[in-house]
Design a protein with these regions (language model features):
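Conserved, well-structured ligand/cofactor-binding cores
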Residues: 1-150
């Protein structure tokens, strides 16, 4: 299947996803959209992050390092690099890759959690994840050792 199936999309809001909705996207290729409430929540949370960075606030993992480096302030010009390095440090795993339906389910679950508006993710990032689901662009996800964090 090269695209989503025709019909109404599943609007995710971070609160109302059920097993039937998950299966319709994962197994049947149903399209996904973001509910207006999710867009608003994600935008509001992102503004909190942007405001904290603009104020020079100390925010763990945003303007500081992680773990034993939590007390290390990261210069503003290196904040993107910090986040990229975090992704790189978590991109390892072993085992056979998950199948397409399992991967789509994980992608939808991640999008749904981000749609709650608690993580500070950019709306554009969440929109791209939804677009990847809809265009059936799936990462290879190892069955063991993969890390998922908000």
């Amino acid at each position: 299947m090269s695209a989503t199936v025709p019909g109404p999309s599943l609007a995710i809001d971070g609160h109302s996803l059920d097993l039937g909705g998950l299966e319709s996207v994962a197994r049947e290729g149903r399209a996904v959209s973001l509910a207006g409430s999710a867009r608003a929540a994600v935008g509001a949370a992102r503004r909190v992050v942007d405001d904290a960075v603009a104020r020079g606030a100390v925010v763990y993992g945003v303007t500081t390092g992680f773990g034993s480096f939590a007390d290390v302030r990261i210069p503003v010009e290196r904040l993107r690099e910090l986040q990229l390095n975090l992704v790189r440090s978590h991109s390892a795993g072993v085992g056979a890759p998950l199948d397409e339906a399992e991967t789509r389910a994980l992608m939808l679950l991640r999008a749904n959690v981000l749609a709650k508006g608690f993580s500070g993710v950019r709306l554009e990032t969440l929109e791209l994840l939804v677009e990847m689901i809809n265009r059936r662009v799936h990462p290879v996800v190892p069955s063991q050792g993969s890390v998922g964090a908000s």
